[in-house]
Amino acid sequence: MKFFLDTANVEAIRAINELGVVDGVTTNPSIISREGRDFETVIKEICEIVDGPISAEVTGLTAEEMIAEARSIAKWHDNVVVKIPMTTEGLKATNVLSQEGIKTNVTLIFTVSQGLMAMKAGATYISPFIGRLEDIGADPYQLISDLRGIIDLYGFQAEIIAASIRTAAHVEAVAQLGAHIATIPDPLFAKMTEHPLTTNGLKTFMEDWASFKQ
């Protein structure tokens, strides 16, 4: 399984990348806006830090607008993946872009049919949202399982990016269900390395060693 960082905070990306567990980065307009910096500059900086797919999202609403934006964004770096919303216009754009060899990540997937349509249109990645489905009482894990089953059954080349990840339990569950990738907010990365028993165990080791050295 691959781990992507779901952030545009360059310093956080640089720090977490040193752990050797980051395979890519995802961003969206909300994440970019929180940084208060130029979109293109931020994406290019991220591409210099992480050697893997870096998702950058279009903001146009029509297929024509998305295609024009995507062509421009794709020129920023070879690792850039253009994020496209799961809409009818988004599917039109994905179809054109896939034929041009531009990698796409179709986002805001909440149903099997949406995922299937995105894959048929040529999406490189599809992003079902875990936390947001839980918010409305739906089962995100069944969605991941169903999408992975369809990929395996029909041989689609798309990879599943489990998004809207909020807890370590989310990561563990989607890993067990076969999601290819989990995209994880930077604060959660730190929490995934921690456990009270680990902390207490290390403390005990150090205390015992200090007593022995005396």
Curated annotation (Swiss-Prot):
CDD domains: Transaldolase_FSA
Enzyme Commission number(s) of this protein: 2.2.1.2
RNA-binding among keywords: no
Cellular compartment(s): Cytoplasm
Keyword Cytoplasm belongs to the record: yes
Catalyses which reaction(s): D-sedoheptulose 7-phosphate + D-glyceraldehyde 3-phosphate = D-erythrose 4-phosphate + beta-D-fructose 6-phosphate
GO molecular function list: aldehyde-lyase activity; transaldolase activity
Biological process per Gene Ontology, one example term: pentose-phosphate shunt
Name under which the protein is recorded: Probable transaldolase
Source organism of the structure: Streptococcus equi subsp. zooepidemicus (strain H70)
Lineage of producing organism: Bacteria, Bacillati, Bacillota, Bacilli, Lactobacillales
Gene name tied to this protein: tal
